[in-house]
Amino acid sequence: MSKIEQSWYQPVSLITILLLPLAALFWLISTLRKWLYTCGILTQFSSKTPVIVVGNISVGGNGKTPFVLWLHAHLTQQGLSVGIISRGYGGHAKQYPLLVDHNSTTLEAGDEPILLYHRLQCPIAVGPNRQQNIELLEQTSAIDVIISDDGMQHYKMARSIECCIVDSARQFGNGLLMPAGPLRETKKRLKSVDLVIENGGNNPQRYNLQPAALKSVLNNSTLTEPILTAHAVSAIGNPLRFEQSLQAQGITLVSTHHYRDHYAYTADDFTQFGDENVLMTEKDAVKCSAFAKQNWYYLPVDAQPTDSVINKLNSLLKDKGILNGL
């Protein structure tokens, strides 16, 4: 995490003050852009397939991916065929849009789409143009609904339902817009969101993250023997939650190593650990499997929404005509 990013979650500093003019400019541009779409001066793209956006108003580490995994399972259980679109941060394919398959790599598609594909084996289209992503899914798959992994601020794309994920621990940091703070939009934006969900905490409208058994980065086999000590490595927005989950399992962390979100690992990053145990997140694991050692493991986590979230979501699905009979 850079010094600027650290300042977002600390008392106002000189760095924050110096960045306020840029934050004001960011607000002006983003507000104008949203207004142009709201007034119809710029045209939205409306797909024939309903779109559910899972996003946030702040950058990094809010925990969208576990909720996307749960949402896919929930919709599938209702008999719907689900596709996913993603920007594919960290990926650099030769051509977009890209339809993810078993040959796709994190270098092409980004870490989160590869994680989602490994877990779900569902149609996933990746690329910077969300309209093209949607059209590719509609042309290649028989789908009933599309989940947009991120995209709340992509006002060119019409959507049926918006779900905003909020980190209960970090909330909105200093409450300022980028780059003076972590916000992509002001907190007033939450008033227009269909479903605001906290990741953790005590809010009735939340989900908790449930860690599963550690798995091998090399072959995805489940670890049966307990690990007592390990090095923790992560390239995610909020590594503290991950490290606390490991410690809660009784694992002593010999060292912790943080890289920027979506960092592309190489084998050289791990030479310092020799043959000692290394633990990482599932998002990190999909980038390290090609050069992993036997004693590298990742921690899968699953979202467990409250009844309040599930009931509100089901009502929205029914009201929007996505699903009948709930």
UniProtKB/Swiss-Prot annotation:
GO terms for MF: ATP binding; tetraacyldisaccharide 4'-kinase activity
E.C. number(s) listed in UniProt: 2.7.1.130
One GO term of the biological process aspect: lipopolysaccharide core region biosynthetic process
Keyword line: ATP-binding, Kinase, Lipid A biosynthesis, Lipid biosynthesis, Lipid metabolism, Nucleotide-binding, Transferase
Pathway: Glycolipid biosynthesis; lipid IV(A) biosynthesis; lipid IV(A) from (3R)-3-hydroxytetradecanoyl-[acyl-carrier-protein] and UDP-N-acetyl-alpha-D-glucosamine: step 6/6
Gene Ontology CC annotation, any one: plasma membrane
Enzyme category, top tier: transferase
SS bonds (residue pairs): none
PANTHER family: TETRAACYLDISACCHARIDE 4'-KINASE, TETRAACYLDISACCHARIDE 4'-KINASE, MITOCHONDRIAL-RELATED
Name listed for the protein in its UniProt record: Tetraacyldisaccharide 4'-kinase
Organism per entry: Pseudoalteromonas translucida (strain TAC 125)
